[in-house]
Curated annotation (Swiss-Prot):
Gene expressing this chain: FAM199X
Region Disordered: start-end pairs: 288-356
Organism expressing this protein natively: Homo sapiens (Human)
Protein name: Protein FAM199X
Assigned keywords, A-Z: Phosphoprotein
Cited InterPro entries: FAM199X_fam
């Protein structure tokens, strides 16, 4: 009897406001409903069972913009006709949207048969979307939608993915000798200044260091007691750095040995002129002695007089060569002492610069004040009368 009553049920408007929980059922044969519970709907066209269908409360909707999720327009054939299945996410107040999800119980719907395009798309959507935190509303519009829509563009939402963590490219070490001052970063400027100061202080003399200081800061005041010069970063420019590089190239250690060899050759020519003259006179005297000895057979008296004269000349020349050799030894000794003094001074200067750099980097001596005191002793010639 109940089957006949369900079969005689007339067409009812789908989810009308007057009947919030109508009995849904299109005209079909008797016994098609698998269960006798009220509100149960067997829709073979959609392949799903609805636990309850009710009108969505407009106050329950979120009035914020959410991601648009639209499935492809899939034509579902039925015995009575064909209706287009359309699903979307509500983005405002839409009175035509009806919720197929119960507020208390979540029912899993099998709207798409396994193996179809929409089944694959729905599985891909489930991986992109958290269904438990979203409020989806399904629509059944009356107008037909073209079934030739783009599946991927309609179904898959444009969900912002997390940015890929690309490995940071390591900055290649640039050749600072070829970069202008303005193209360097702060770290590169500090590194290059330390490199220049170390190169100049270790490979160049005092005169070259003073010239470079004048190039960097022409108004710098340097006293004879100063042992260091601090280079400020704002003093250097591209033009000054270019001049410093050219000066270092001109006075580099590769060029210095040639100049020193040239100076040494001139000095040796000037200092050993007496030695060469002495050696030449000695050789001439020895030759004259040999010639006089060879000619002794012809004239004995002449050879005796010549040999005595040549011996006296050779003795004076030997004294001259000894004094010249002594002068050379003295000059070599003085040059060696001068080199040792320069080496010790350079070593002490490097040590002071290293200590000053450590103090500057530590920051412990920023507020240091150096006071110079001068004590003058007065000569007390007269006795001081204490009793007065």
């Amino acid at each position: 009897m109940s089957d006949e009553a369900s079969a005689i049920t007339s067409y009812e408007k789908f989810l009308t406001p007057e009947e919030p929980f109508p009995l849904l059922g299109p005209p079909r044969g008797v016994g098609t409903c698998p269960s006798e519970e009220p509100g149960c709907l067997d829709i073979s066209d959609f392949g799903c069972q609805l636990s309850s269908c009710h009108r969505t409360d407009p106050l329950h909707r979120f009035h914020t913009n959410r991601w648009n999720l639209t499935s492809c327009g899939t034509s579902v054939a039925s015995s009575e006709g064909s209706e287009e299945l359309f699903s979307s996410v509500s983005v405002g107040d839409q009175d035509d949207c009806y919720s197929l999800l119960d507020d208390q119980d979540f029912t899993s719907f099998d709207l798409f048969p396994e193996g179809s395009v929409c089944s694959d798309v729905s599985s891909s959507i489930s991986t992109y979307w958290d269904w438990s935190d979203s409020e989806f509303e399904w629509q059944l519009p009356g107008s037909d939608i073209a079934s030739g829509s783009d599946v991927l563009s309609d179904v898959i939402p444009s969900i912002p993915s997390s940015p890929c963590l690309l490995p940071k490219k390591k900055n290649k070490h640039r050749n600072l000798d070829e970069l202008p001052w303005s193209a360097m970063t702060n770290d590169e400027q500090v590194e290059y200044i330390e490199y220049l100061s170390r190169k100049v202080s270790t490979e160049m003399g005092l005169r070259e260091q003073l010239d470079i200081i004048k190039i960097i800061d022409p108004s710098a005041q340097i006293s004879p007691t100063d042992s260091e010069f601090i280079i400020e970063l704002n003093c250097l420019t591209d033009e000054k750095l270019k001049q410093v590089r050219n000066y270092i190239k001109e006075h580099s250690p590769r060029q210095r040995p040639a100049r020193e060899a040239w100076k040494r050759s001139n000095f040796s020519c000037a200092s050993t002129s007496g030695v060469s003259g002495a050696s030449a006179s000695a050789s001439s005297s020895s030759a004259s002695m040999v010639s006089s000895a060879s000619s002794s057979g012809s004239s004995v008296g002449n050879s005796a007089s010549n040999s005595s004269a040549n011996m006296s000349r050779a003795h004076s020349d030997s004294n001259l060569s000894a004094s010249a050799a002594e002068r050379i030894r003295d000059s070599k000794k003085r040059s060696k002492q001068r080199k040792l003094q320069q080496k010790a001074f350079r070593k002490r200067q490097l040590k002071e610069q290293r200590q000053a750099r450590k103090e500057r980097l530590s920051g412990l001596f920023l507020n240091e004040e150096v006071l110079s005191l001068k004590v003058t002793e007065e000569d007390h010639e007269a006795d001081v009368d204490v009793l007065m």
